[in-house]
């Protein structure tokens, strides 16, 4: 599934074994020197040091420009005090995170260097390189994360953000990852955060951090508690509105946050690795490539359907992997149809188009029905129809290995328009003029309408009824039942 507003590198990872005699949930040892702003026995998000750090970071944000700098010298005295509160809090909290010791020490150094620079554009590369959460994928292990960064689907400015989170890594995922290797993949649960994460952002990617250069082949994290919570909220409302009789497995997910979190971990783990697997006609990460947005729709949907296909096969197992594989199939289907299709603006909404495409494909193949204002599925026939769409996208990719880039774009458009109706004013639908066809790829992209494939009447009506529900999921966590 896409979790981005702009194309981003997908990532892969493998857990590192931690010695058995290490506490799985680090606490402050009773015999260490006490620090007034860290109190033993309190949960992390209630620690005074965390609350001080969170308040200081939040107060610092209005002083920062979009690039993270603080240009007004008149704000520097206040900024120095706030940064001092941040670094003091990090040092006080560090004993709670022994696995992140090198990172937290480097973070203090980066903050001090930023102050010494006169609050120029921040450079937190050193602390980012020291932060390696993929090396400690242990269920429940906490992390303290503090960086100047933008948050995807959240803040567009590189402001100082702080968050507390913990790892989601159940035993069945550790077993699954031995086959579906994803060595830099990190799954997390949000505990508390600054305003940049009180949004729709559900990812933590290194490339969002303010730094002098972007490291290569690095980790990536997804907050599955947020994904699961908004799935449960949205699907509950949408199924009531559409009078959908939910299958028992899907109904279980709506009443069980942890079950749904684990299901999303499985989906995301397989999805992420799929970006660089298969017969691919182009750079699977699509880095720095400007192209029509419907190509991103197909790529994200391809990876979701690859996960769906894998889970159809795994669903025959009689164990935790099999149980969750059957639930992933519902998650892909309902998240794509009920949330993706009607979330966000209609400006080059590639995730939205993927949901529209899946719905229309299933409807046109007679396995999804909207009759007498009630939604229904022929569940026995759904897997074959979904896999048929996956096959169609895979076929497009395989054939395009032998095509020029813009010819691939044209073929991709034909696949999408064969299922979803384009805008009546579309140049692509009428046929691009000769000067565009003979020109540079930029002309092709410029000719795509912002809303090249408008919502159908079904989705227009559903969006109006679901608008408030979806809007209310901004900032949601697994605790918000």
Segments and roles (model prediction):
Residues 7, 40-151, 160-162, 403-481:
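Extended, compositionally biased alpha-helical segments that mediate assembly or anchoring
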Residues 20-38:
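Long, intrinsically disordered low-complexity tandem-repeat segments
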Residues 40, 261, 308, 312-423, ...:
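Long, well-structured alpha-helical subdomains associated
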Residues 91-251:
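Contiguous, non-catalytic segments that form substrate-binding/exosite surfaces or channel walls
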Residues 296-312:
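An active-site-proximal "capping" alpha-helix that borders the catalytic cofactor pocket
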């Amino acid at each position: 599934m896409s979790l981005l507003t702009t194309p981003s590198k997908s990532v892969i990872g493998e857990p590192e074994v931690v010695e058995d005699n290490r506490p799985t949930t680090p606490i402050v040892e009773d015999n260490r020197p006490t620090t007034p702003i860290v109190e033993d026995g309190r949960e992390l998000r209630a620690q005074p040091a965390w609350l001080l750090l969170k308040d200081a970071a939040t107060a610092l944000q209005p002083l920062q420009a979009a690039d993270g700098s603080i240009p007004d010298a008149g704000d520097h005295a206040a900024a120095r005090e706030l940064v001092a509160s941040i670094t003091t809090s990090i040092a006080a909290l560090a004993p709670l995170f022994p696995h992140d010791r090198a990172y937290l020490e480097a973070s203090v150094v980066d903050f001090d260097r930023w102050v010494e620079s006169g609050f120029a554009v921040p450079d937190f590369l050193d602390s980012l390189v020291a932060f390696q959460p993929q090396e400690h994928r242990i269920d429940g292990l906490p992390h303290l994360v503090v960086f100047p960064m933008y948050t995807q689907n959240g803040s567009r400015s590189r402001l100082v953000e702080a968050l507390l989170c913990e790892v989601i890594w159940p035993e069945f995922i550790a077993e699954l990852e031995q086959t579906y290797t994803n060595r830099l993949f990190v799954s997390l649960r949000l505990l508390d955060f600054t305003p940049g994460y009180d949004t729709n952002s559900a990812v933590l990617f290194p490339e969002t951090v303010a730094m002098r250069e972007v490291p290569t082949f690095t980790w990536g994290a997804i907050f599955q508690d947020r994904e699961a919570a908004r799935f449960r909220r949205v699907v509950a409302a949408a199924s009531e509105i559409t009078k959908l009789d939910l299958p028992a497995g899907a109904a279980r997910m709506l009443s069980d946050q942890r079950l749904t979190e684990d299901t999303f971990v499985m989906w995301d783990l397989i999805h992420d690795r799929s970006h660089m697997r298969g017969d691919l006609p182009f750079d699977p990460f699509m880095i720095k490539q400007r192209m029509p947005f419907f190509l991103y729709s197909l790529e994200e949907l391809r990876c979701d359907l690859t996960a769906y296909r894998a889970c159809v096969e795994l669903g025959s197992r009689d164990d935790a992997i099999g149980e969750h594989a059957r639930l992933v199939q519902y998650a892909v289907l309902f998240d794509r149809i009920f949330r993706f299709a009607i979330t966000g603006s209609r400006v080059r909404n590639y995730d939205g188009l993927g949901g529209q495409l899946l719905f229309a494909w299933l409807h046109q193949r007679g396995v999804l029905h909207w009759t007498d204002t009630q939604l229904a599925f022929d569940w026995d026939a759904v897997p074959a129809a979904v896999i048929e769409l996956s096959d169609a996208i895979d076929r497009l990719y395989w054939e395009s290995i032998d095509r020029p880039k813009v010819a691939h774009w044209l073929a991709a458009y034909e696949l999408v328009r064969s299922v979803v109706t384009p805008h009546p004013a579309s140049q692509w639908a009428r046929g691009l003029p000769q000067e565009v066809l003979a020109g540079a790829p930029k002309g092709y992209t410029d000719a795509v309408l912002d809303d090249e494939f408008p919502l159908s009447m079904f989705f227009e009506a559903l969006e109006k009824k679901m608008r408030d529900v979806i809007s209310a999921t901004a900032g949601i966590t697994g605790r918000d039942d």
